[in-house]
Curated annotation (Swiss-Prot):
Gene label: rodZ
GO cellular component: plasma membrane
Organism encoding this protein: Streptococcus pneumoniae (strain ATCC BAA-255 / R6)
Keywords from the named record: Cell membrane, Cell shape, Membrane, Signal-anchor, Transmembrane, Transmembrane helix
Gene3D superfamilies according to UniProt: lambda repressor-like DNA-binding domains
Protein name: Cytoskeleton protein RodZ
Membrane topology note: Single-pass membrane protein
NCBIfam families, per the entry: rodZ_Strepcoccus (NF041534)
Extracellular side: 132-276
Biological process annotations from GO: regulation of cell shape
Length: 276
């Protein structure tokens, strides 16, 4: 049974998700939007989102995921109006049951191909093991003098990369990262009066800013403008703000910084400097 009613954006999104048979957790995996932000959109609480720019982006992703016309949703958001929605009466408990039943069927049907794959992999492993064992058994032993020469050569050769590795390690130790979630701290040892910070993206859009620099007012990085640089003094710490963390790279004096500990949607980085 269907009926045409005016609904808020959040109500339309929620009903479309239910009609698609998606839970919020499944929708989060599909859109890569945090769960609390999905809940805020369904509650029409758009003030909880980072900015109107990200609100529009999240609404567009949500609409695509549940097969809605994203332009209608965005127009309603921009004008603050409601949406005329063809509502289908749906029993949410019934949909949940269907989803569980569907998942059980998928698990049952997918078990057999997995069994055959494991069996095939074991067959290959047994064959390779037998071949290697048979090859080793048929090889004649080398004279002891020849063995000694090979060991000597290997030992002298391997000493070269060791010194290179030590040198590389001393360079990397100049930068250390601590913290996690939406805030990390970077400690950088340097004898310079100023350092160069570079922020770059490949295929995402993110607003970034660097305090105490020419980027203090912020700039938006995107596939059209992929990077921005700032020169900062080392006499005091600086704060880097990221509107979107995922997909943003940071280098300090051309040294790449590991930002994997920043796991939130948005984040802040505090950079402190100590004399080397």
């Amino acid at each position: 049974m269907t009926s045409m009613r005016k609904k808020t954006i959040g109500e339309v999104l929620r009903l479309a998700r239910i009609n698609q048979g998606l839970s919020l957790d499944e929708l989060q995996k599909k859109t890569e939007i945090q769960l609390d932000m999905l809940e805020a959109m369904e509650a029409d609480d758009f003030d909880q989102l980072p900015s109107p720019f990200y609100t529009r982006s999240f609404l567009k992703k949500y609409a695509w995921a549940v097969e809605l016309d994203d332009q209608i949703v965005l127009d309603a958001y921009d004008s603050g109006s409601m949406i005329t929605y063809e509502e289908v009466d749906v029993d949410e408990d019934e949909l949940t049951g269907r989803r569980r039943s569907s998942k059980k069927k998928k698990k049952k049907t997918s078990f057999l191909p997995l069994f055959y794959f494991i069996l095939f992999a074991l067959s290959i492993l047994i064959f390779v093991t037998y071949y290697v064992w048979n090859y080793i058994q048929t090889q004649p032993e080398e004279p002891s003098l020849s063995n000694y020469s090979v060991v000597q050569s290997t030992s002298s050769t391997s000493s070269v990369p060791h010194s290179s590795s030590s040198s590389s390690s001393s360079i990397e130790s100049a930068i250390s990262v601590s913290g996690e979630g939406n805030h990390v701290e970077i400690a950088y040892k340097t004898s310079k009066e100023t350092v160069k910070l570079q922020l770059a993206v490949s295929d995402v859009t993110s607003w970034v800013s660097v305090s105490e620099s020419e980027l203090e007012g912020g700039v938006t990085l995107s596939p059209k403008k992929k990077s921005a640089e700032a020169t900062v003094a080392t006499k005091s710490p600086v704060t880097i703000t990221l509107g979107v963390v995922k997909g943003v790279d940071l280098t300090v004096d051309n040294q790449t910084v590991d930002l994997s500990k920043l796991t939130a949607q948005t984040g802040q980085i505090t950079v402190t400097f100590t004399k080397n």
